[in-house]
């Protein structure tokens, strides 16, 4: 089971170690609000694709307000000069949701080498610059262990190195207990658009076991 299912979704729940990316309560309009959240997340990722965004958490504490928390490696790109970019984003979300109370919080990801989303985006960016996929994967693995990662698995699929036949190459180092629910495993994917086609990147990072006095998000 742990080998097939998404490592993040497998651990989501109030008694487990992961949390939902959208927190809201709506009896009749759940579908509409959920689609809005997807559009907001897509808009942020497109506008600030150079900021290397790790996660976009959307909370709706009431029917009149929305709180958006953005975790990124380069928060200055999202904020902009004197907050100009974040003001544009706020207005776009106000027009999309028809809400006047829009709050946006930006958080910097400091240990970005053990953040699966940022690592996957970094590998994809290197592949687009025609860096060898083996070199990109090995560099990511080494950097992860330097920042405290206990295990990492990286997979690249597609026409690697411009080969005629698509294939999958992967590297794994350290522990990767996918079946253990208390194991804090971060998982993410990314796509590299190359001249030979699309290359898919998957990253699993094991950070250690969950402790009762600490909840990982």
Swiss-Prot record:
Molecular-function GO terms, alphabetical: mRNA binding; rRNA binding; structural constituent of ribosome
Entry keyword annotation includes rRNA-binding: yes
GO BP of this protein: translation
Cited PROSITE patterns: KH_TYPE_2, RIBOSOMAL_S3
Pfam families, per database record: KH_2, Ribosomal_S3_C
One annotated Gene Ontology cellular component of this protein: cytosolic small ribosomal subunit
SMART domains, A to Z: KH
Gene3D superfamilies: 3.30.300.20, Ribosomal protein S3, C-terminal domain
Record's keyword annotation contains Ribosomal protein: yes
Xref: InterPro entries: KH_dom, KH_dom-like_a/b, KH_dom_type_2, KH_sf_prok-type, Ribosomal_S3_C_sf, Ribosomal_uS3_bac-typ, Ribosomal_uS3_C, Ribosomal_uS3_CS
Keywords: Ribonucleoprotein, Ribosomal protein, RNA-binding, rRNA-binding
All copies of domain KH type-2, residue ranges: 40-110
CDD domains cross-referenced by the UniProt entry: KH-II_30S_S3 (cd02412)
Description of how the protein assembles with itself and partners: Part of the 30S ribosomal subunit. Forms a tight complex with proteins S10 and S14.
Function, in words: Binds the lower part of the 30S subunit head. Binds mRNA in the 70S ribosome, positioning it for translation.
Record NCBIfam families: rpsC_bact
Similarity comment: Belongs to the universal ribosomal protein uS3 family.
This protein's name: Small ribosomal subunit protein uS3
């Amino acid at each position: 089971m742990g080998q097939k299912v998404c490592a993040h979704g497998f651990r989501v729940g109030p008694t487990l170690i992961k949390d939902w990316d959208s927190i809201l309560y709506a009896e009749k309009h759940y579908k509409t609000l959920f689609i809005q959240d997807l559009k907001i997340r897509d808009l942020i990722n497109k506008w600030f694709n150079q900021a290397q965004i790790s996660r976009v958490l959307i909370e709706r504490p009431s029917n009149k307000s929305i709180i958006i928390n953005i975790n990124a490696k380069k928060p200055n790109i999202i904020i902009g000069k004197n907050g100009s970019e974040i003001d544009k984003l706020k207005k776009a979300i106000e027009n999309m949701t028809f809400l006047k109370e829009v709050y946006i919080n930006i958080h910097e990801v400091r240990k970005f080498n053990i953040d699966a989303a940022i690592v996957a985006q970094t590998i994809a960016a290197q592949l687009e610059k025609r860096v060898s996929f083996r070199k990109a994967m090995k560099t990511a693995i080494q950097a992860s262990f330097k920042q405290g990662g206990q295990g990492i698995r990286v997979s690249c699929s597609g026409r690697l190195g411009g080969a005629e036949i698509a294939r999958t190459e992967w590297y794994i180092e350290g522990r990767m207990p996918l079946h253990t629910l208390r194991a804090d495993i971060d998982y993410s994917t990314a796509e590299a658009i190359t001249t030979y086609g699309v290359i898919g990147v998957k990253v699993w990072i094991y950070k250690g076991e969950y402790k009762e006095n600490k909840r990982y998000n």
